[in-house]
Amino acid sequence: MSFDTHIATEANDIVLIRHFDAPRALVFMAWIDPVMLAEWWGPEGFTATVEADVREGGEMSLTMYSPEGEAYPIGGHFGEIVPNEILVMIMDASRHSAGWHEAIKAGFVDAGGRPEDYNADPIETRVTFEDEGGGTKVTVRQTFTMATMRDAHLKLGSGVGWSGSFNKLDAVLAKTR
């Protein structure tokens, strides 16, 4: 069964909430197992490679590939990890292409930001996992340094990308159960 993704904004955050028809331990595993994560990370039509040392302070490297073959590398590290409950990732997209950064910067300016204030600061992504109705409620909270950066990411399709990723995660969970 597929569910909708609820997307909201709060302060400098994008908040995404999605129910998955799978046990919490399995959903959490899909976020920390590099093989499973590579199967669903990125918008629909994208593929991914993942390397992850899943421990607090451990490094992570994810690269999404568009259907046209453009690479979107993301580096970072893990923050707080509470098995089956909380996963925090500090994600750095500074290695994305110049074209991607120009698009984000344009969205940042359109959202009211001054060009000289644009930055590619890392984004804290906090994921919580809760039992809900025989499945799992996942809440993803991405915290940006400024609301204008949040709005720029939404304008470039962050919400649509996450929804597509979650659709792919549904499929991974269905075949794993």
Q: Residues of each region from the PLM?
A:
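Short, highly charged C-terminal tails/helix-capping segments
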Residues: 173-177
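Glycine-rich portal/gate segments that line the openings of hydrophobic small-molecule binding cavities
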Residues: 49-110
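A short acidic/glycine-rich loop-to-helix N-cap element
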Residues: 101-107, 113-118, 143-164
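Hydrophobic ligand-binding cavity/cleft-lining segments
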Residues: 1-47
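Hydrophobic pocket/interface hotspot
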Residues: 27-28, 37, 60, 78, ...
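Short coil/turn motifs at secondary-structure junctions
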Residues: 23, 81-83, 94-96, 132-134, ...
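Short, P/G- and charge-enriched loop/turn segments at secondary-structure junctions
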Residues: 3-4, 109-117, 126-127
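Hydrophobic/aromatic beta-strand elements that line small-molecule binding cavities or substrate pockets
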Residues: 18, 49-50, 74-80, 122-131
